[in-house]
Structures are given as C-alpha cells and as structure tokens.
Amino acid sequence: MDFKYDVIVIGAGHAGCEAAAAAANLGSKTCLITMDMNKVAQMSCNPAVGGIAKGQIVREIDALGGYMGLVTDQTAIQFRILNRSKGPAMWSPRAQCDRNKFIWAWREILENIPNLHIWQDTVKEIIVENGEVVGLKTFWDVTFHARCIVLTAGTFLNGLMHVGKTQLPGGRMAEPASYKLTESIAEHGIEYGRMKTGTPVRIDGRSVHYELMDTQDGECDFHKFSFMNTSVRHLKQLQCWTCFTNEEAHNVLRNGLADSPLFNGQIQSIGPRYCPSIETKIVTFPDKEQHQLFLEPEGETTQELYLNGFSSSLPMEIQIEALKKIPAFKDLVIYRPGYAIEYDYFDPTQLKHTLESKKIKNLFFAGQVNGTTGYEEAGGQGIIAGINAHINCHGGEPFTLARDEAYIGVLIDDLVTKGVDEPYRMFTSRAEYRILLRMDDADMRLTERAYKLGLVKEDRYALLKSKREAVENIVNFTRNYSIKAALINDALENLGTTPLRQGCKLIDLINRPQITIENISEYVPAFKRELDKITDERKEEILEAAEILIKYEGYIGRERIIADKLARLESIKIKGKFDYDSLQSLSTEARQKLKKIDPETIAQASRIPGVSPSDINVLLVLSGR
C-alpha cells in the first residue's frame, strides 16, 4: 500500500472532516486518520448544530463548499431560527440532529470523495526535517509521508476524564486518549497548555415526566442550513422540553462541592466561560433560585435524551440525587453521568491566518487543539486549513477570510492575533461588522471566492448566480417603480402604516417596518407580476434576501464604508520589517507582543491586546505613512 500523500489529516472530528474533504475536493491526494471510523464527525456533547453566531459559521462553511450544513439538513430532527425578535444581523439557525445518522451521513460523503482515503489508527509522532513536516508515525508502526499535515485531534491529546474523584484517561467516554503526539510537536518549540470542557448526563426518556415540562417546538418554514436546492426536512420533527432546577436540587449540589473536581483542586484547567457546569452556576450565582434546563432528543428513534444546562463532573450519585429533586425527573434513570475532560491545546498565536504553524512549515492546526469550543468553530477552521494545505502542496495564493467577510475570518483573526486563555466560543458580539455577516448572504459573500478556488462546483455557482440576479431584479424594480398616494393610501391604512402625502418610490414604502415585499405586492399589481416571474424553488429565500437588502441598505452601506477604511491598514505589510526590540519609541508591552505574534499588517497589529494607538502611530511613521 502507498503511504505517501499530499495532505494527511489527523483526527476525524468536525474540523478534520471538513479539512480532509476540502483538500481532496481541490485535488490533493488526502488521507484522514481516525481512531474509529464509526465515530467520524461525532457530536461529543450536544446533538445540535448552529446557534447564535455558530449558525452563521455553518452557512459560511456551506457557501465555501463544505458539508456541515448539508449533513445537518439531512439529519435534523428539529430546526429553529434564534433571535427572530431582533434584526437579521442577529438571526441564527439551529438544529437538533440525530446523532448516529449525522455520523453515517458524513461517513458516506467521505467514502465517496475521490482522492480521499480513511485510515484507522492512532498517530504518535510527526516527522520534521529542516523545519518542515514530512510525515508521521502511528502506533501500528506505520510511517506515512506527507507534504502537509493538518492536526485536528480535538480533546484526545492526553485527555483525562473526571467524575467526582474518579479519573479516567480518554478522549471521550469509552474512547482512548492520544499519547506522545503533543510531546512530539512540543519538541520543535511549539507551546501548549491544558483546557477543560464537560458534558451532562444522558437520560432514559422512559423515566421522564414530560407532563411536568414545557414543550419547545421547531419551525417548519423554508429556512435550512445549506444554500443547495435540497428538501427542507428529511426526518420526523421532534419536540424539545424545558424545565428549571430548584433550591432543593441546589442544596444537594452544594453539599457535593467537596467532591467536585472543579472545586477541590483536582482540575486546574480553564473551562468554557459561556457553557459553565451546573456546580459553577450555583457557586457563581448563589442568589439565583433556579436555572433553566433543556431536554433534547438524541435521535429520531432512540429514548436517549441530552440534558442541556446540566453539565457536571460531580460524583454520579450527587448528579442523580440533585436531578431527582426536580419534579419531571423524580423517577430518573440515566444512561451515563456527566463528566469533565482535560486535554492539550496549542497556543494559536503561533499560527498564520492560514492556520499553518509559524515554526513548522506545512503543519496546520484546526479545531479544539487551537483552544476553541464547538463543532461549528472547528468546522470553520477545518475547511480553511484544508484549503491552505492543498495550496501549499500545489501552489497558489494563501486563502484567508477578512473580518468583514466572514465569522470564520473573525474567529481565526481572534485566535492568531489575541490568543486564548479559555475555550473560545463565537458570538455575534465578537464581530464588528455584524450587518455585513448575516446568515442570509453567506453565499453572496463567499461562494464566488470558493468557485474561483475550485472548491465550489458549477451546480452551486449556478444557484448563486440565479439567486443574485433575482434579488437584484427585485431591488431595482422597487427602486425605480413610482407609487401614487391616491392609489395606495387605503392599502397603507389596511397595513397599519401612515398614508402618503405625495407619491414615492416603492422602495421607500418597503423600508417601513409594517411593510413587507409580500404584503405590499398584493396592492401593487405590477410588483406582483414581477415577483410571479420567480419560478425558483428558493423563492421565499430570495424574497427574504431582497427585503433585508432594502430595509437595511443604509446600515449596510455605512458599515461597508467603515470596513473599507480599516481595510487600508490591511494593505500595509510590516512582517519582517522591524526589529521590535530596538524600537524604544514603542511601549515595553507592545514590543513584547509584537515580537511574539509578528503581525502581517498594521491592521493585525492594531488588534493585539497591549498595542496602543500611539504604538500603531509609531509603526505607521516608520512605514512611511
């Protein structure tokens, strides 16, 4: 068997699957190495994809030609758009998925990609020659040769699980950890640390009193994750349920804190701030009498349920006793307890924006090994790493995304510029150009770039062009079509908005909050005829995109002007230009940070914590600006 590849991806989680698929689809001979072929793209924690800002990332992955969105649509058992009460910049898709069907849908995709081979094994060592990675060795003593390697090992590097005082080595429940690989990489001067995450109990649904819980239904409209022309819902759509903890449960949890790995010194690593354990919640918020819990199905046919909001590493007996104090769980039976896991990660400031190591050429890092948390954040990094690994093998310009192009761009820029001291989770608040990074236009932003790269194929590109043309036609019609006050005022009163004193353009009416493209078209026959010309199955998607462009035109334009101004600083390259130690006009902290991160541009330098505006002015002067 030939063990020589262009690209090898270590780990078949969400980052690894996207990385391997991208590299192979671009034409690189690719190998994806995983400990267990039956666990590819395993959803280790919540059986859900998307959420606030995360849903936008999944749509961006899809727009780039990735697969997470397609697999999610294919295996979703509940779909919702979050933040509907806010503006479209904040709307985020989220889906519950069938955990096992998600795995097998991904495996079917991977096994049918030309150029992609899957190998089941554990990697123990990378081979580096003259500062460049050239291969790896596995525990089966197989040597692989590669031009590029992408590390996407998730929580498996020296993983250690905790339930109370019990500690068990492993990368996930009932799965072994990966040893020696961290040390092999660290030998070459790459710094690493430890982080922690956790997961809640899994509950036998036959023991739950659903009548004592509130139901949470999904939505059945046209929204989905993928921009491809696929059917909206494939599987039976299921409910979720909500309830609350109570003071009795909190007292049980407090009494168990002495045996909590988080509070007795057993766990020293930092956990995710925005997904705290239940014991952290009751300690951090002692006055809060209840915390909301979400009970979520693990699949279409299983009785297994995931208890969102009750992540814990307390002893199993404490977890069960506390939950039984909640009326809906008074007869609780669990499949397994919640647990915490500690694992190795690598400081992401040691990476370029392509996710290639600055210290070892052709070695890329993506996913949780970079200090992030979440399937979506992992997948976004994975597709960028896979693309750039292919480019390193076959030539071409590095492929990066700017902060005004994608949430993936914000994510990677934050990682490589600011670093992490806790697991990084994406939020809309991390993006300064939220109005430009909406869920509805990820295809408009990214698909053409991926098409030029060769990752997006003709069918997806044709869908983009037809959608773009239809949206432009609608916007142009409303911009040019004149409305007479006498002919529309009765309709405006029916729609609950102020009558006109004089004529206006149709676009001015649609800008009103009470007016939508669909409701005003019922009173403007010419506009209705224009909309009826759209025979595309995605008509609702097209109308939504056009309406957002119309209603938010001013905000979008203003944000674009700001982004373009700051983009000028991105054009001022400074990497390798300065000996920062010798620049006494910079603050001491700035010299240290600039030397460590070695930013590519003035704009990146300006985002480094500890580098002040006056330090940036010094660099601008020295750059001749």
Swiss-Prot record:
Tagged with keyword Lipid metabolism: no
BP GO annotations: tRNA methylation; tRNA wobble uridine modification
Cofactor dependence: FAD
Keyword annotations of the record: Cytoplasm, FAD, Flavoprotein, NAD, tRNA processing
Any one GO CC term of the record: cytosol
Residues annotated as binding FAD: 11-16, 123, 178, 368
Residues that hold NAD(+) according to the record: 271-285
Source organism superkingdom: Bacteria
MF annotations from Gene Ontology: flavin adenine dinucleotide binding
Location (main, coarse): cytoplasm
Localization (cell): Cytoplasm
Assembly behavior: Homodimer. Heterotetramer of two MnmE and two MnmG subunits.
Purpose: NAD-binding protein involved in the addition of a carboxymethylaminomethyl (cmnm) group at the wobble position (U34) of certain tRNAs, forming tRNA-cmnm(5)s(2)U34.
Homology family: Belongs to the MnmG family.
Protein name (Swiss-Prot/TrEMBL): tRNA uridine 5-carboxymethylaminomethyl modification enzyme MnmG
